[in-house]
């Protein structure tokens, strides 16, 4: 009967290990050794594995079972059977008072009386507290305590940090019967080792080859972009999904081809509906029908090209998989691989292996980060960093060069590595590109502007607002909800943090950043350490902008070092010297007329692009328009912001009115011409054709 209780309410992990049903466990030798040390004690020989979800606590127990089967454990543990207790089965159907307690007592007695020693594994150990605790009954934890203390019931428990703190720490009598084994998230090298040990199992299951580059990419990309979860769990899921996607691509029609076929089908349905309307005498849909026909022609051409490519890829893939199975055809395999690569040209419809691109594609679908950003070569990108940012930030070459040099040093590991990647204070007049620099950096370095965390410090002018940034302390309203800054960085540790208008913040708020700039950590309201070491922190300020503009208007050839000397006393008066020494100051100069003209051209090009996107208009702009707008924007106190203001006040209202007039008259404009007249100012001419 007692053996029946064991078979009914527990599962034999060592039996599964003997049958080869457990995946190999690597990279956890230290933790398994700690467990063996504790299990070999005479009394209170009960380890409890504590770690974040997904770090591999259950896998540790499976690793111990594999070692027991292999005999790679001390003599006292070799005859041991490792069983996992299922509390759900214990509770299911235990409707009568005392039945749950009797079942658990039977399991405890069966373990103690078993001829072969039994180790009991209790996953989610916090569920012991309160389990079965009906009115007048005792919970599972209280039934286990005596046996645990005497060492008669050797138990391995597992739980997360939050549940350990919430349940087990409060029950000191239960906590002292367990010895904690901390299970931390592995570093990248250890995580790669873990995935390599599992790779063959997943390759065999999906019947695909997984490259070693894919393993490394799964670890690095999951750590960088799947920040809510822990390694190795998230990397394993990523690799598993990528392998499933490769298998599916070999067995089904590619997504690109399916998408085009769906678009053609939807256009066909719309065309049929319009023809039915015309047949019963409704209004003429000739314009839309001709547009549908043009779209269909484009899509059909794309579909035919894809079908030809797909057929050729299928043929080559079949030959390649066949040649791989014969080791004597290695040279042929290489030629087929090269031929397939030449056909695909970085736009593959089929994937033969799980490679970096496949893994990056899964991450792109999960996170929304563009695939092109995930596949960037970071080394090449760093070499051209100032050029990439300079496409958006005009006229600040010296400042961008200074930022790029410091970031290159940080990224190549030449700096100390204690604090954030870099901390910059961007000083200069309003509208010269300081905030745009942060947007461009987030886009270039971290895959998009969504990686920019913006905190406007003008909202933090009182000392009590510190709690909004880092979270309320215990006992205060809002405790447990996290802080605006700490939660944003915890969820997206690879990001650009923009502290806008830093000179307006209260000094107590600035004191918060001493340790962030120095060590790269901030402790939030709940006591968790938030890691800032992968962030780039930019602060913007208008301090000294009047001095800068006055000096540069009088002496345009003033050097950077002279400008730094000019504003240093002002910065030292406002920021404490200890804080000032923790970041690099970068000076942004007022925009020159040539830089302003470039910005005017960029802004007008964006307007033209929107017009073409929404209305199909082709736009021509007279050179005098650029000259007139540039001269009107050369106000030193507003910078490039005046360009947007002028366009919103002078161009867009008139243009929108004319567009609405043409649309109301059922006329479709084809082209827009922008000119400048000394008498009338901006001249807008829409050339249209009458509606059919």
Give residue ranges: language-model regions.
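AAA+ P-loop NTPase nucleotide-binding core of proteostasis motors
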Residues: 1-692
């Amino acid at each position: 009967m007692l053996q029946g209780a064991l078979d009914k309410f527990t599962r034999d992990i060592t039996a599964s290990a003997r049958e080869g049903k457990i995946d190999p466990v690597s990279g956890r030798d230290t933790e398994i050794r700690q467990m063996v040390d504790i299990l070999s004690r005479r009394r209170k020989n009960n380890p409890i594995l504590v770690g974040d979800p997904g770090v591999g606590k259950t896998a540790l127990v499976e690793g111990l079972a594999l070692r027991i089967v292999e005999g790679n454990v001390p003599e006292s543990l070799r005859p041991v059977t490792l069983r996992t207790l299922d509390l759900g089965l214990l509770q299911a159907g235990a409707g009568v008072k005392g039945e749950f307690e009797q079942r658990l007592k039977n399991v405890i007695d069966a373990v103690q009386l078993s001829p072969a020693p039994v180790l009991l594994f209790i996953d989610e150990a916090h569920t012991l507290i309160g389990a079965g605790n009906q009115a007048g009954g005792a919970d599972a934890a209280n039934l286990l305590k005596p046996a645990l203390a005497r060492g008669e019931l050797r138990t391995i428990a597992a739980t997360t940090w939050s549940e350990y703190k919430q349940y087990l720490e409060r029950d000191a009598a239960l906590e002292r019967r367990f010895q904690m084994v901390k299970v931390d998230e592995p570093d990248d090298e250890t995580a790669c080792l873990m995935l390599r040990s599992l790779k063959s199992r997943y390759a065999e299951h999906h019947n695909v080859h997984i490259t070693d580059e894919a393993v490394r990419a799964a670890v690095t990309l999951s750590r960088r972009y799947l920040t809510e979860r822990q390694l190795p769990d998230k990397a394993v899921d990523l690799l598993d999904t990528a392998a499933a996607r490769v298998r599916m691509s070999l067995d089904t029609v590619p997504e690109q081809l399916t998408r085009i076929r769906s678009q053609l089908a939807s256009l066909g349905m719309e065309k049929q509906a319009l023809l039915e309307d015309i047949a019963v005498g409704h209004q003429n849909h000739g314009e839309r029908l001709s547009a549908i026909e043009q779209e269909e022609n484009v899509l059909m051409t794309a579909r035919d090209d894809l079908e030809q490519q797909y057929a050729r890829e299928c043929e080559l893939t079949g030959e390649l998989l066949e040649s791989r199975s014969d080791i004597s055809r290695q040279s042929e395999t290489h030629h087929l691989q090269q031929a397939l690569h030449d056909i695909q040209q970085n736009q593959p419809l089929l994937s033969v292996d799980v490679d970096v691109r496949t893994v990056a594609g899964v991450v792109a679908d999960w996170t929304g980060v563009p695939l092109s950003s995930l596949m960037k070569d970071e080394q090449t990108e760093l070499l051209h960093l100032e050029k990439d940012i300079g496409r958006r930030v005009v006229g600040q070459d010296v400042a961008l060069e200074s930022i790029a040099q410091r970031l290159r040093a940080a990224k190549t590991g030449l700096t100390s590595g204690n604090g954030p990647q870099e901390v910059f204070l961007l000083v200069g007049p309003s509208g010269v590109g300081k905030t745009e620099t942060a947007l461009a950096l987030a886009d270039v370095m971290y895959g998009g502007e969504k990686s920019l965390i913006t905190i406007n410090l003008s909202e933090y002018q009182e000392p009590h607002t510190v709690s909004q940034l880092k979270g309320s302390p215990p006992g205060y309203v809002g405790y447990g909800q996290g802080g605006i800054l700490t939660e944003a960085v915890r969820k997206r540790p690879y990001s650009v943090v923009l502290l806008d208008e830093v000179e307006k913040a209260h000094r107590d708020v600035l004191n918060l950043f001493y340790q962030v700039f120095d060590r790269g950590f901030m402790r939030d309201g709940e006591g968790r350490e938030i890691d800032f070491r992968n962030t780039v922190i930019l602060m913007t300020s208008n301090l000294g902008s009047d001095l800068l503009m006055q000096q540069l208007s009088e002496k345009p050839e003033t050097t950077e070092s002279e400008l730094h000397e000019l504003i240093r006393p002002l910065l030292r008066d406002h920021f404490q010297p200890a804080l000032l020494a923790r970041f690099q100051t970068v000076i942004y100069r007022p925009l020159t007329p040539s830089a302003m003209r470039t910005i005017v051209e960029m802004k007008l090009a964006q307007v033209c692009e929107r017009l073409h996107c929404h209305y199909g208009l082709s736009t021509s702009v007279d050179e005098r328009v650029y000259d007139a707008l540039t001269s009107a924007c050369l106000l030193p106190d507003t910078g490039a912001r005046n360009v947007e203001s002028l366009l919103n006040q002078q161009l867009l209202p008139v243009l929108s009115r004319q567009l609405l007039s043409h649309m109301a008259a059922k006329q479709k404009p084809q082209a827009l011409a922008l000119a400048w007249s000394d008498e009338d100012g901006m001249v807008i001419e829409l050339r249209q054709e009458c509606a059919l």
